[in-house]
Amino acid sequence: MKMKLLGIILLVSFPFVLGFAGIPIEEGENSVEVGEVERSCINVGDFCDGKKDDCQCCRDNAFCSCSVIFGYKTNCRCEVGTTATSYGICMAKHKCGRQTTCTKPCLSKRCKKNHG
């Protein structure tokens, strides 16, 4: 009796296990396979590839920032540069092929005096 009950439990739970394991289950002719859509750029806060350039990050002043542990880049994410670095990052992104609008930061005393 125990073996019969075990067989029924396994038979009922098998589709659930396959679903959680990520194995696609085809159900007839109209089964749809969902694929990952490739994005042209990565949003701020999302993971990026530390081996690629900063063009992978969407915003004009965003760059791929990584933690370095024992010489290896890990936990790379797209981050926004500081006021001091944003303009340089934006200017470097002109090579990415996207239209970038870079506004020079107001850092000097003279600039701050004139622009509030």
Curated annotation (Swiss-Prot):
It holds the Pfam family Toxin_34. Residues 1-19 form the signal peptide. Disulfide bonds join C41-C58, C48-C64, C55-C90, C57-C78, C66-C76, C96-C102, C106-C111. Expressed by the venom gland. It comes from Phoneutria nigriventer. It is found in: Secreted. InterPro entries: Omega-agatoxin_II/III_CS, Toxin_34. Keywords: Amidation, Calcium channel impairing toxin, Disulfide bond, Ion channel impairing toxin, Knottin, Neurotoxin, Secreted, Signal, Toxin, Voltage-gated calcium channel impairing toxin. The presence of a 'disulfide through disulfide knot' structurally defines this protein as a knottin. This is Omega-ctenitoxin-Pn3a. Belongs to the neurotoxin 04 (omega-agtx) family. 03 (type II/III omega-agtx) subfamily. This toxin is a potent and practically irreversible antagonist of both Cav2.1/CACNA1A and Cav2.2/CACNA1B calcium channels, while it displays a partial and rapidly reversible block of Cav2.3/CACNA1E calcium channels and no effect on Cav3/CACNA1 calcium channels. Inhibits glutamate uptake from rat brain synaptosomes by an interaction between cysteines from both glutamate transporter and toxin. Blocks potassium-induced exocytosis of synaptic vesicles in brain cortical synaptosomes (IC(50)=1.1 nM). Residues 20-38 form a propeptide. The modification Histidine amide is found at H115. GO terms for molecular function: calcium channel regulator activity; toxin activity. GO terms for cellular component: extracellular region. Could be used as a diagnostic tool for the autoimmune disease Lambert-Eaton myasthenic syndrome. The keyword Ribonucleoprotein does not apply.
